[in-house]
Design a protein with these regions (language model features):
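Conserved beta-strand hairpin/beta-sheet module of binuclear metal-dependent hydrolase folds
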Residues: 1-25, 61, 121-123, 170-180, ...
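Catalytic metal-binding/acid-base residues of hydrolase active sites
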Residues: 39, 69, 184
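A short helix-to-beta-strand connector/capping loop
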Residues: 60, 83-89, 102-103, 174-175
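Metal-dependent phosphodiesterase/nuclease catalytic metal-binding core
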Residues: 94-198
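Active-site metal-binding motif and surrounding structural segment of the metallo-beta-lactamase
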Residues: 14-65, 87-94
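Hydrophobic/aromatic-rich structural module bridging two neighboring secondary-structure elements via a short loop
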Residues: 65-71
Length: 198
């Protein structure tokens, strides 16, 4: 997924960099990598990807999400990529369901049925409501604040606090992608796939 200059990747097999190259996408803006499980075809491309991101002068932290044991598995793989110019943040999943808000993404992780700990993911990108000029005028919101409020910022002008909900209409339908792999059929998949765009 890509949104507002940020990218999210699910799994990182050995062909990941080639697939990114074919799409013309740089790995540098990948801020989040979600792992379904730790079989080699889902994680063996990580050391090379991290090195490529470092060589592209990335300095911002990268968040890694996956089943319990993530940090141990990644550190074992990093013996060939020990020095990185950015921090790795680890989120290890232990419960059956988790939800995270990272950057523009709402990430739902849910346990599926594989022969090792394995999770599926639903990635949602919420979409704010449209700017409502009449609503802004009715609440005496200064025009100089409109642009920042429309971008989701809260601000204070002349001792008055203005919030985005003062000028935005109801939330619009965002985008939802649900992904699961290597699992036996379980009801939770249909639950998270409901209303997904993909």
């Amino acid at each position: 997924a890509r949104c507002d200059g940020s990218s999210l990747l699910i799994d990182c097999g050995e062909g990941t960099q080639e697939a990114l190259k074919e799409k013309g996408w740089s790995p540098k803006p990948i801020d989040v990598i979600c792992f379904t499980h730790y079989h080699a075809d889902h994680i063996s491309g990580l050391p090379g990807l991290l090195l490529t991101m470092g060589n592209a002068e990335r300095t911002e932290p990268v968040t890694l999400i996956g089943p319990k044991g993530l940090e141990r598995v990644v550190n074992a793989l990093r013996t060939i990529a020990p020095e990185l110019p950015f921090q790795l943040k680890f989120i290890e999943l232990e419960e059956n369901r988790h939800q995270f808000h990272i950057g523009p993404y709402v990430i739902d992780a849910y346990r599926v049925n594989h022969n090792v700990a394995c999770y599926g993911y639903s990635i949602s990108i919420p979409r704010a409501g449209r700017f409502d000029v009449e609503r802004a005028k009715a609440q005496n919101v200064p025009m100089k604040a409109w642009s920042r409020l429309q971008k989701g910022e809260t601000l204070e002008l002349d001792g008055v606090t203005y919030t985005p909900d003062m000028v935005l209409g109801p939330d619009r339908k965002g985008l939802k992608v649900t992904y699961c792999t290597d699992t036996r059929p379980v009801p939770v998949i249909a639950e998270y796939a409901e209303h997904a765009d993909l």
